[in-house]
Amino acid sequence: MSGAVATGGAQSAGLGAAAAGCCSSASGAGSAALLSGGSGIAGRLPSRVLEHIFSYLELMDLLNCSLVCWHWNNCLSDENSEVWRSLCARSLSDEAMRSDILCNLASYKGKLKSFQHALSSHDCSRNVYIKKNGFTLHRNPIAQSTDGARGKIGFSEGRHAWEIWWEGPLGTVAVIGIATKRAPMQCQGYVALLGSDDQSWGWNLVDNNLLHNGEVNGNFPQCNNAPKYQIGERIRVILDMDDKTLAFERGFEFLGVAFRGLPKTCLFPAVSAVYGNTEVTMVYLGRPLDG
């Protein structure tokens, strides 16, 4: 029996590889004609069979599969199906899945997408690292240094939202915002790194100043006696590349638009910190909900 199960698993994995190869070659005229419209063999496979095969594939293969035909797309449309659960289990750490880090993401597909957009371990200061959960930045206790990180993926169009929160002391400067690929992620001293040049835009949570091009662009939010940031409080960042604006929310309160007239270039979620051993978590949420 165990041999039969092993053989069945190997056959399913082989079918998964074949499906992935089929998807990657579907851009060819012959393959496209065979697979499109659900009229070929691909379109006649039962959903439960497709779901089993798809559970062996990686994210990019699944995204390609969703473009093959209506039947395959429909099979992958359930964002909490076994396909997405299986990929979540393989891709995300147990810590991330068990903790409340991803509590505002209802689907397995949403959790996977958030991981794809998390802070980058390859695009950050040498004085920070991304923890095993895949979402939290830890700043090492290095004196006289300001250290930051960018998200893995930047945006040049559309509307996007993500959450950021501190899980340790802020220190004298703690900035959240956006940056181009050219913005530095480390500098000497304790400064507001995001907003220190024309390549980044930031909100310093310590003094509520908006920063860009090395200048203070006023206080935020624009109200009397604005409350100070509390450790653990989730701030939602809303980037609208269609209207070229950056806005923030705290809890269920819209704080307003912080920056307007953003350039038509690729902008990345970013954060900078100065306090030793502090930690910052970022979770990409996708398209913001209006209202």
From Swiss-Prot:
Gene3D superfamilies: 1.20.1280.50, 2.60.120.920. InterPro entries: B30.2/SPRY, B30.2/SPRY_sf, ConA-like_dom_sf, F-box-like_dom_sf, F-box_dom, FBXO45-Fsn/SPSB_families, SPRY_dom, SPRY_FBXO45. Pathway: Protein modification; protein ubiquitination. It comes from the Eukaryota. Residues 39-87 form the F-box domain. GO terms for biological process: proteasome-mediated ubiquitin-dependent protein catabolic process; protein ubiquitination; synapse assembly involved in innervation. The keyword Membrane does not apply. One of its GO terms (cellular component) is synapse. Residues 97-289 form the B30.2/SPRY domain. The keyword Cell wall biogenesis/degradation does not apply. PANTHER family: F-BOX_SPRY DOMAIN-CONTAINING PROTEIN 1, SPRY DOMAIN CONTAINING SOCS BOX PROTEIN. Belongs to the FBXO45/Fsn family. This is F-box/SPRY domain-containing protein 1. It comes from Danio rerio (Zebrafish). The gene is fbxo45.
